[in-house]
Amino acid sequence: MVISKSPFIVLIFSLLLSFALLCSGVSAYGRKQYERDPRQQYEQCQRRCESEATEEREQEQCEQRCEREYKEQQRQQEEELQRQYQQCQGRCQEQQQGQREQQQCQRKCWEQYKEQERGEHENYHNHKKNRSEEEEGQQRNNPYYFPKRRSFQTRFRDEEGNFKILQRFAENSPPLKGINDYRLAMFEANPNTFILPHHCDAEAIYFVTNGKGTITFVTHENKESYNVQRGTVVSVPAGSTVYVVSQDNQEKLTIAVLALPVNSPGKYELFFPAGNNKPESYYGAFSYEVLETVFNTQREKLEEILEEQRGQKRQQGQQGMFRKAKPEQIRAISQQATSPRHRGGERLAINLLSQSPVYSNQNGRFFEACPEDFSQFQNMDVAVSAFKLNQGAIFVPHYNSKATFVVFVTDGYGYAQMACPHLSRQSQGSQSGRQDRREQEEESEEETFGEFQQVKAPLSPGDVFVAPAGHAVTFFASKDQPLNAVAFGLNAQNNQRIFLAGRPFFLNHKQNTNVIKFTVKASAY
């Protein structure tokens, strides 16, 4: 039997059905988008990079590819959202319904579109935040590793160079409080650049890691000036006025600086006699009366000089401690300098890489200057070292009897591995319940005595790794690139280096891979 229906009822029913199908289509699209959430795909891609990549460089390239794919998926999803929104509006206009119903339909399309767009933006910011927190957590879990991009603080920067300083060693790494008085810093100057004269309240050792230049420093007694290149090490007494010139026409001059402050432990400052911006001249802190007397100059002349500096400051803007040097200026400074000695002596500069290597074979070389043989390093009780590992080579496991070594990577990629008892105690201590803090520490030490945890860190240019005294450590280069590093041994007087695997000191991955396998839980060290 056929039942007759009112045309009006049929029309209303058709409109309601169309509107429901339209809204369900938008909702289904939303579900489809979240089912293939780019953020989830990005996280899966990152996990694959971490598990499948065998080298640090390979992992970085993989992660960059994940980032590009994620952004491309975001762009495509945004375009798809726009297309679906326009289709939704078009269907609303095509329906034969009143203006009010049509506006409700279009408003529903707009709300769905904005909700999904807002969700995608939140996902993007959340995944960036989570990634940053993950990197910070990795550094907290490895207090001996200081990655370049998170650990250095820039003190001075302009167009011609920069000066940056590593965070204090024990700032986030309590096991390193024994070396917290030392600071590591970096100068980087463009070709043909002059670094303004300055002095600092710290003993310092300058290690040239790249480029060519001239380092000059003046004390109250004499003046020392050296033409330097990669491998040159210069000891600079506290309070010496230092100025540096980058001579090369192509390469930047980079210098690693180890400083031992003489005022506040772990804190030192640079003082500039001349400057018109950042840095400022320390003469500006003195009154005209003092300057008139000291320089035997009338106040009008001093005001003229200071006003001229203020004018330069306004004209030159951000010009700072790094200035472009003229060729004749560079020649004049370099002609007055001498070359460092190859061997020990009273002079304050040597070329470490010109010495005979302490260890050497076809897989790598290791150079070292100890305070027993080089008197200029005795004040700071520091040894300076450098090593080069060929592709796939291993610096076999060893430990130092007294010295803690701060290793700075200059070129190439690789890894460091170390056996650490401190992290083993921390990991077990963090898992225990709420006990008295002192009892917890005592129990943790008793339970983990003689147990070790493996510390592993990827190494790339600019990274820093610290190997404390007594900790067995090894370094190995990636399979496709050599690994170059310089190191400062702190508390190095009468230090001995003990190799766990005997000779040879450098191996290739193919020769013997067993030497890098640490036992992370052992009954004896």
UniProtKB/Swiss-Prot annotation:
Coiled coil: none annotated. It comes from the Eukaryota. Residues 154-303, 350-513 form the Cupin type-1 domain. Residues 424-433 have a biased composition (Low complexity). Residues 119-145, 308-345, 424-452 are annotated as: Disordered. One of its GO terms (molecular function) is nutrient reservoir activity. PANTHER family: OS03G0336100 PROTEIN-RELATED, VICILIN C72. Belongs to the 7S seed storage protein family. This is Vicilin. It comes from Theobroma cacao.
